[in-house]
Regions:
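N-terminal cap/lid segment of alpha/beta-hydrolase-fold proteins
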Residues: 36-41, 46, 52-58, 72-75, ...
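Short beta-strand element of the alpha/beta-hydrolase
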Residues: 185-195
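Short amphipathic alpha-helix adjacent to the substrate-entry channel of hydrolases
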Residues: 201-220
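Alpha/beta-hydrolase active-site loop
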Residues: 229-250, 271, 408
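Alpha/beta-hydrolase fold nucleophile elbow
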Residues: 251-263
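Mobile cap/lid helix-loop segments that gate and shape the active-site cleft of serine hydrolases
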Residues: 281-316
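Short beta-strand/loop motif that positions the catalytic acidic residue
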Residues: 320, 326-332
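C-terminal catalytic histidine-bearing segment of alpha/beta-hydrolase fold enzymes
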Residues: 353-416
Length: 416
């Protein structure tokens, strides 16, 4: 190589190197993540704002959390910073990402697992009777470089909330009882019933309700040792035992409880409001049914009362004495819960029930219309006892919007 060729090559290296340095200088090297509530209940929205960016700069904001099995979930959105170098997640719509429209909590509900279809996955952090909170890590990345990070804590249990596991041998029922801080104002207890999945579910809901001041019992009624293996021949009296136990707790209104039933649990909730109005003073029905269906998955009778099968007919409402709130999705593919919710309201009207009753129908949501918001959830489940995935209908975005709108209305219903 001659001197002239060597000089030309050196010049090219200098130019390329200088160009890379100039390119790096055009991007932000640090940013600030401002969060109004870095520690908050899991059902509470947080307001996230990223500042210190260059004007109009492309930036990716991501969320990451680990479920109870240690699997990582992630959401992300790419934005163009505004003229002041700010991205406000409440007001900024992503250019691309795991959600589409401006949504301050989009990074939370849109998270998906590292592998697999997010429509078939449900984010499940540690249960609140085992882990009182979980963490979400937010990061800001520009041109492939992480320039800011912050960890948020999402709590299930407010300060002072306690929980106790109930057993058949000791308490006559199986479940987990969550109680508000001692000395809290007496409020209506909430009895929480899951659907055909069985076991003791809805513990997240119970913990959050107790954190809002409502004694809450997540009750198992089949699929628990000592109880029926499947949803068949479940005595309504079992629920009454649980309701009486709940209303006797410190901080609970002794006049009665509200039963909150999801899917098949909504049948039991409405039957209890009709059959035991002295104990059940209201009902919240998620993705409800207005008719008694057979047992699941093997048929037979789902419910009994006084030892006799509850007839498989439309659920009567003539003795309902308390308020009823039904929440349904218009795209429910399990059953037509929106139409069924409306029929329940019509029957209450026809029966001249004077207590408040309302159906909230979210047209684009599915069977996953409830309950509390901001936890990543899929739109299909594997049916109990089978390996068959079943679509619940709706979309993740529509279900998330329904929960975000519906949960405050549930809390207002309980407070009324």
């Amino acid at each position: 190589m001659g001197l002239r060729d060597w000089f030309v090559g050196l010049t090219a290296v200098v130019i390329v190197g200088g160009g890379a340095a100039a390119c790096a200088a055009r991007h932000s090297t640090h940013a600030t993540i401002d969060v109004d509530a870095p520690v908050a209940l899991a059902d509470q929205p947080v307001h996230v704002r990223v500042s210190g960016l260059r004007a109009r700069e492309d930036v990716t904001v991501a969320s990451q959390a680990a479920d109870a099995k240690g699997q990582l979930w992630r959401g992300e959105a790419t934005f163009a910073a505004d003229g002041d170098g700010v991205v406000d997640l409440d007001r900024s719509a992503p250019v691309s990402g795991t959600y589409g429209d401006a949504d301050g909590m989009g990074l939370f509900w849109s998270m998906g697992p590292a592998t697999g279809d997010p429509d078939e996955a449900w984010f499940s952090p540690g249960y609140p009777d085992a882990a009182g909170a979980f963490e979400v890590r937010l990061t800001v990345t520009v041109a492939g470089r992480e320039i800011a990070a912050r960890t948020l804590t999402r709590q299930w249990n407010a300060t002072g909330v306690t929980h106790r596991t109930l057993t058949l041998d000791v308490d006559g029922v199986a479940g987990v009882l969550f109680l508000p801080s001692p000395g809290a104002v007496r409020r209506t207890g909430v009895l929480l019933l899951g659907g055909s999945e069985g076991g003791v579910g809805r513990k997240y809901d119970a913990a959050l309700l107790a954190s809002h001041g409502y004694p809450a019992l997540a009750l198992g009624y089949f699929g628990v040792p000592g109880l029926p293996e499947t949803l068949r021949d479940i005595p309504l009296e079992y629920f009454v035992t649980a309701a009486r136990l709940l209303r006797a707790q410190p901080g609970a209104d002794p006049r009665g409880v509200v039963v909150n039933g999801y899917s098949r649990g909504s049948e039991a909730a409405l039957l209890l409001a009709e059959s035991y109005p002295d104990v059940v003073r209201g009902a919240i029905l998620y993705a409800p049914n207005d008719t008694v269906w057979p047992g699941f998955p093997n048929g037979g009778n789902a419910w009994t009362i006084d030892g006799a099968p509850v007839p498989r007919t439309a659920i009567p409402v003539t003795h309902v004495a308390g308020p009823v709130l039904a929440i349904a999705g218009g795209k429910d593919r399990v059953w037509p819960s929106a139409a069924q919710a409306q029929r329940i309201m019509q029957r209450l009207d026809d029966a001249h029930v004077t207590a408040a009753h309302q159906a909230l129908v979210y047209p684009d949501a599915g069977h996953g219309v409830g309950s509390f918001p901001y936890l990543a959830a899929g739109t299909s489940v594997t049916s109990p006892g089978t390996d068959v995935a079943r679509s619940l209908g709706g979309t993740r975005e529509a279900d998330a919007a329904a929960r975000s709108d519906g949960w405050p209305k549930v809390l207002a219903f309980l407070a009324a």
